[in-house]
Amino acid sequence: MTNYAIILAAGKGTRMKSDLPKVLHQVSGLTMLEHVFRSVAHITPQMNVTVIGHKAELVQEVLKEKSEFVLQTEQLGTGHAVMMAEEKLADLEGNTLVIAGDTPLITGESLKNLIDFHVNHKNVATILTAKAEDPFGYGRIIRNHDDEVVKIVEQKDANEYEQKVKEINTGTYVFDNKRLFEALKNINTNNAQGEYYLTDVISIFRENKEKVGAYVLRDFNESLGVNDRVALATAESVMRRRINKAHMINGVTFQNPDATYIEADVSIAADVMIEANVSLKGNSCIGAKSVLTNGTCIVDAQIGESVVITNSTIEESSIADGVTVGPYAHIRPGSQLDKNVHIGNFVEVKGSHIGENTKAGHLTYIGNAVVGSDVNFGAGTITVNYDGKNKYKTVIGNNVFVGSNSTLIAPLEIGDNALTAAGSTITKNVEPDSIAIGRSRQVIKEGYAKRLPHYPQK
């Protein structure tokens, strides 16, 4: 049987108190809407139809070719939102999943189980439900003595008995597609909210003696719909635990998983050690047996095997096997560190390629440079790459020794095996096997200090 999906993403999300559409707020590095789409993909829908409204263009920009779009100009309830998809789906045979775009914790496995349950029980409609300790605010699932679903009652419309029911409607459903759109023609706004409730189609099916079922989630957390920043933080917490648990099962050691932030698309090999307060973001990849210490932040970077990163930040760069970075180093976008490079404390590298076994131990800036292998940077070395308007390249050969407090003014080339004397300002190219000295001779004026204000007075 063919599957389709309707994703509800038209709401403003007033309680979020944000200029951004609710479904575009992020959980673990992805928008809530992207999380939903990844889960929906597990049912292999032939067509996704996203109902958009508030700031529709922003939602379209996130999804692009992943979905068809229909516009809901007025938000008149969930039933009204699904009506908007009629032009795309009404005449098609198959099953249609209806899901809200603000449910980032729902898993693909649960949606696949929901579809299978629906098909196996030959239902015209199947509701995804959950058991809640505190069901206040949720629509209740009302069953008869034969345990069949009779109706769904919203909180504001529920009587005293119905409000005690703990089985709640998650807002996710599967319908026979044609019967869904036929039933939608018969719902109205005669309720406390004055809206078109999608849940009213369940009552219509029951009145017609059609089969309605309910599939109960194993994990209540999956049912969370995010309506405010408190729920967003809850979703973030649950997702973080879920992601970190998966990495631990795959052989990653966490010093404190509750204090480690790893986004959804990060890849980590076995035998990696991650200390507390580490953040791994974007499409970062961490190689086997690497160690990330407290305070490290890695964004969209590729980290090799047996790398040690100590309390440092690495962005959009490639780090080869055996490299050590930090503490307090910053590897900025566009950098490549080859095998066994050492970048020490308070060193910044930007847009540079650094060859194997090169060392910059402390207090150094390497920007827009191509550096060979076995180079040593003395403390305080600066590549002067910017004149206020343009950036210039520094090229350093193999086995070069750069003396402490050298200032290398680009554009500049230093040949293999060359040396720059400590304290030099280098403005011209240095030939291989040469030493470059670019500093004034020391001058000593005996007794001159007595004339200066700092000198102790008798």
Swiss-Prot record:
Q: Report residues binding UDP-N-acetyl-alpha-D-glucosamine.
A: 8-11, 22, 72, 77-78, 139, 154, 169, 227, 332, 350, 365, 376
**GO MF entry, a single one:** glucosamine-1-phosphate N-acetyltransferase activity
Give the first-level EC class, as a single word. Answer: transferase
Which residue stretches belong to region Linker?
230-250
What Gene Ontology terms describe where this protein resides (cellular component)? cytoplasm; membrane
Catalytic activity of the protein: alpha-D-glucosamine 1-phosphate + acetyl-CoA = N-acetyl-alpha-D-glucosamine 1-phosphate + CoA + H(+); N-acetyl-alpha-D-glucosamine 1-phosphate + UTP + H(+) = UDP-N-acetyl-alpha-D-glucosamine + diphosphate
Q: Where is this region: Pyrophosphorylase?
A: 1-229
**Keyword field contains Cytoplasm:** yes
Quaternary data: Homotrimer.
- Protein name according to UniProt: Bifunctional protein GlmU
According to its UniProt entry, this protein's organism is Streptococcus uberis (strain ATCC BAA-854 / 0140J)
